[in-house]
Amino acid sequence: AKNSYKNCHAGGVYSIVLASRGDRLQRMFFADSIHELYKNSPWEASECNVPMSVGFHGHHCDIAITGLMGHIVNWEIENDIQGRLHLDEYLYSSGILNKNGCFVWTGQERTFRDKARVIITEGGRVEMSAIELHTIYVKGGSRAAWLVEEGEPANRVSYTYSNADLEKLNFDKLYHTVSESEILAIARLLISNDGGAI
């Protein structure tokens, strides 16, 4: 289970490495029923009513997202000085890459507007460039799984934009090693697709 984690980016989310080619990973994400991705609702976070669990972020490479089970919403935003979405800018050091993730506020607030809200179901696919900003929403209490395939690495500084105070995020609760038994339980759940408990 090397480089596979539970509570990855947010509570109740698993990241399982399926394949690796050099710096390029193929990972499966699984949101258990206790996940916190419901806090990224485009219909609530856009009004700043609920602090997001995963801020809008780009990646160190181009990615492709493919739905495996359930429904996810890939919510993308873009810069717009007249946009109504006001978010703080944070410099991000990945907990996946170095296991010591942290956010530092840059002192800047940025303004954005919606670019896309794409519902991804089983077999659905979205491709994104490294510079595109997104977050993932899953309905509270439901389970979902999706595949993320990485493209060529890009040299870029990674920022995250959020309506939550990310400097106060407790990383001790995130990026825990996932056991082989947990991975097998997730695999059985995906095969049966019955939404049973992990």
Question: What name fits each language-model region?
Answer:
Residues 57-74, 78, 149:
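Short, conserved beta-strand element in jelly-roll/cupin
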Residues 1, 26-57, 75-81, 120, ...:
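Conserved short histidine dyad/triad with adjacent acidic residue
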Residues 1-22:
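N-terminal, Lys/Arg-enriched amphipathic/low-complexity engagement segments
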Residues 137-140:
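Asparagine-centered strand-capping/turn motif at beta-strand->loop junctions
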Residues 76-130:
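Short acidic-glycine-tyrosine-enriched beta hairpin
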Residues 155-198:
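Long, compositionally biased interface segments
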Residues 142-158:
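A short hydrophobic beta-strand segment most commonly corresponding to one strand
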Residues 132-135:
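Short, charged beta-turn/beta-strand-edge "cap" motif at the junction between a beta-strand
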